[in-house]
């Protein structure tokens, strides 16, 4: 398997520290609001990556944090007349609702910044002792990128170029423009923790370094996140961690592309900002997941009403295939057609193409294409045979590949199924009695439920619109 490494700017063969095992850290959300569709992309992409690694036989330890103390959280707490704990707990709960809806599995561990203060203080203390960081009079502690000769190696920007665009705010006491806060001295009314430098709270970048070291170790296999995190967040993580621990921080860096809305980059200031909840209420959660993995993960994705509708339609093709297989199995026969082995080989060729695509830097776009080729093959060459063995073989293969992508996870609604089957039986009886007005009336009733009927030689098939 090859993955594109942002550090080297090329695809590299995946070689893990411990053969057969993968240690991955993904930057999680700052929990002060509902997650937006930009947040959804890394969640769905790296969940799919994890699923695929497990599918290929790796044991995956996947850690994703919650930033539960931050300027934005404090501001939100003031706006709502509450406290940072209430705000973070509220939006972590909402996060679980949205991720469950998108079929994003829980990480192995979901550490919170506030539960790792001791580890954070320990790393900062080491950096101060080694001369990479320094405390100032107001209780802040700053890191000096100029002391780390490899600073800029991830974003491929020399420190002098970065310094040219940096500014110092009047209230900051740092020595150089690029210095960044590891610890922030307490301000009146803000939450704080005790430290050797006085009461305060951690900076954003140090939180991830601490949680990586505690839950995965000093060196990990893969660190991932959005392209917007390459600089300064991931660059600063590398500097802190490598200066503290004296070993490489991560062997591979994976970054997903941006989300555009109607071909314009999504931003609150432009008013083209959508939460996952907003979109899910109109279109459901699964089309969001489908959209997020419909393009190669490093390329940008465009969100629009037309595109999300296309995603719904594509998903419906997958659900129709699943339901058609189930329907065909109800009347399946034990007899095997003469070309059964040839048909199985054809079906397996789509699996081979799927693996080839996913092995090539998680190319989910080509992976999906292979799944739809499988669907066409099933519809043309499996379902018409009514062969029980072939139908089961096809269904298991279909479920295997869609499961890796985290798709087709909605269970059948048994109550709805029963009601629809009851109406179909009544319609069939009306047609036999030549009461076509009643049959048409029942068909209209079924259509009003969002169900499409298809009359076939083997009976009536149906699916949701």
Language-model-derived ranges and their functions:
Residues 265, 273-465:
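Structural preference for alpha-helix termini/caps and helix-kink/transition segments
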Residues 78-84, 108-114, 198, 226:
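The substrate-binding groove and active-site-proximal loops of carbohydrate-active enzymes
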Residues 8-13, 17-105, 455-462:
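N-terminal, positively charged nucleic-acid-binding surface of large information/translation enzymes
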Residues 66-70, 92-95, 105-120, 138-147:
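Short, glycine/charge-rich beta-strand/loop segments that flank catalytic centers
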Residues 1-32, 47, 97, 118-326:
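Alpha-helical recognition segments enriched in aromatics with Gly/Pro capping
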Residues 58, 132, 451:
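Short phosphate-binding/catalytic loops that engage adenosine nucleotides
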């Amino acid at each position: 398997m090859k993955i594109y490494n942002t550090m080297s700017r090329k695809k590299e063969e995946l070689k893990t520290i411990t053969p057969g095992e993968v240690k991955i850290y993904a930057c999680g959300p700052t929990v002060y609001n509902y997650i937006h569709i930009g947040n959804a992309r890394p969640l769905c992409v790296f969940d799919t990556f994890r699923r695929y690694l497990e599918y290929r036989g790796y044991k995956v330890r996947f850690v994703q944090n919650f930033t539960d103390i931050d300027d934005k959280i404090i501001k939100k707490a003031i706006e709502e007349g509450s406290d940072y704990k209430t705000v973070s707990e509220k939006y972590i709960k909402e996060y679980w609702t949205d991720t469950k809806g998108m079929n994003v599995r829980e990480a192995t561990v979901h550490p919170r910044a506030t539960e790792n203060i001791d580890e954070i203080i320990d790393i900062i203390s080491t950096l101060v002792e080694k001369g990479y960081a320094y405390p100032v009079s107001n209780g802040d502690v700053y890191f000096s990128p100029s002391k780390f000769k490899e600073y800029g190696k991830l974003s491929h920007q020399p420190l002098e170029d970065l310094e040219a665009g940096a500014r110092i705010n009047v209230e900051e006491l740092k020595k150089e423009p690029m210095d960044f806060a590891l610890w922030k001295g307490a301000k009146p009314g803000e939450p704080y923790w005790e430290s050797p430098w006085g009461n305060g709270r951690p900076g954003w970048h140090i939180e991830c370094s601490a949680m990586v070291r505690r839950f995965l170790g000093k060196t990990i296999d893969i660190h991932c996140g959005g392209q917007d995190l390459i600089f300064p967040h991931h660059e600063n993580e590398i500097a802190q961690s490598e200066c503290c621990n004296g070993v490489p921080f991560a062997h591979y860096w994976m970054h997903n592309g941006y989300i555009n809305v109607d071909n314009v980059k999504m931003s609150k200031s432009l008013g083209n900002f959508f939460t996952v909840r907003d979109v899910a209420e109109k279109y459901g959660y699964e089309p969001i997941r489908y959209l997020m993995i419909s393009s190669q993960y490093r390329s940008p994705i465009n969100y629009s009403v037309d595109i999300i509708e296309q995603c719904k339609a594509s998903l419906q093709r997958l659900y129709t295939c699943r339901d058609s297989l189930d329907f065909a199995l109800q009347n399946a026969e034990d007899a095997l057609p003469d070309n059964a082995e040839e048909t199985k080989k054809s079906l397996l060729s789509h699996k081979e193409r799927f693996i080839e695509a996913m092995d090539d830097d998680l190319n989910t776009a080509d992976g999906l294409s292979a799944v739809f080729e499988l669907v066409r093959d099933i519809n043309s060459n499996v379902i018409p045979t009514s062969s029980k063995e072939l139908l089961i073989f096809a269904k298991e293969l279909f479920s295997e590949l869609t499961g890796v992508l985290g798709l087709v996870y909605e269970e059948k609604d048994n109550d709805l199924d029963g009601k629809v089957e009851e109406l179909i039986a009544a319609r069939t009886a009306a047609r036999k009695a030549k009461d076509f007005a009643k049959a048409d009336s029942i068909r209209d009733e079924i259509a009003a439920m969002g169900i499409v009927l298809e009359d076939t030689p083997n009976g009536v098939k149906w699916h949701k619109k």
